[in-house]
Amino acid sequence: MDFLINKKLKIFITLMETGSFSIATSVLYITRTPLSRVISDLERELKQRLFIRKNGTLIPTEFAQTIYRKVKSHYIFLHALEQEIGPTGKTKQLEIIFDEIYPGSLKNLIISALTISGQKTNIMGRAVNSQIIEELCQTNNCIVISARNYFHRESLVCRTSVEGGVMLFIPKKFFLCGKPDINRLAGTPVLFHEGAKNFNLDTIYHFFEQTLGITNPAFSFDNVDLFSSLYRLQQGLAMLLIPVRVCRALGLSTDHALHIKGVALCTSLYYPTKKRETPDYRKAIKLIQQELKQSTF
């Protein structure tokens, strides 16, 4: 039901959140031609490019990202209002809400799995915190998929194997005769690259204890960009955890890094536990769990 939301806005939001024409066509139940026409019309009206087409994916321009940030809150409000004042006899569509830092590759896999299964869902992406999740799970017909674990809220935690594991980068000056000086590592902050913040820490803790003899590593979860992290690493101020696939993409030398295998990415699923369980919930959660378990990140 879209009697309040403009068609162009819905298509723009969907393409921003799926990054794919093929996925968007399944979500919106329309063919690719009308989607392309709407985006072309918008770009002509705005006199700005919205997306860059590359290898079957849509990369939003800076202009598109600015528009998205400004209109998304209004879109969420209108969508919630439609749900509230719509026909009461009609079953509300299940909402799948991804937090803003959830990996795009896994997000697309989940959307594809739900679409192929015939599950009718409304896909959304938004910034969340513990309070927002609590409100969503009390008032909306939704499942929130987050890269963060809010321990006070009951959730299902799914683990996805991380392809290649992660590399622990150690300052060059901490190496003696080709081996890390354990005494100098103790107490040195361990920074996380953005893609590694929601890895299962038990495996990483075990590596520090068994391999380096450090029982209480100084993990730091501050939001530090990659450039600043690499600078602190170079200056000997911190160690740095980066996924292997990111190292390959950036062409980083691993001469002064240790390989940690068996690492998994943790996904938390939040949903209204007090509501009467419905077939839609059971089916969607089972599909999401299965997809995350079988996939690699």
UniProtKB/Swiss-Prot annotation:
Keywords: Activator, Cytoplasm, DNA-binding, Plasmid, Transcription, Transcription regulation, Virulence. GO terms for biological process: regulation of DNA-templated transcription. Pfam families: HTH_1 (PF00126). InterPro entries: LTTR, Tscrpt_reg_HTH_LysR, WH-like_DNA-bd_sf, WH_DNA-bd_sf. Coiled coil: none annotated. GO terms for molecular function: DNA binding; DNA-binding transcription factor activity. It is found in: Cytoplasm. One of its GO terms (cellular component) is cytoplasm. Gene3D superfamilies: Winged helix-like DNA-binding domain superfamily/Winged helix DNA-binding domain. Residues 1-61 form the HTH lysR-type domain. Disruption phenotype: Decreases expression of genes encoding virulence proteins. Decreases virulence in mouse. Residues 21-40 bind DNA. Its main location: cytoplasm. Belongs to the LysR transcriptional regulatory family. Positive regulator for the plasmid-encoded virulence factors SpvA, SpvB, and SpvC. This is Virulence genes transcriptional activator. It comes from Salmonella typhimurium (strain LT2 / SGSC1412 / ATCC 700720).
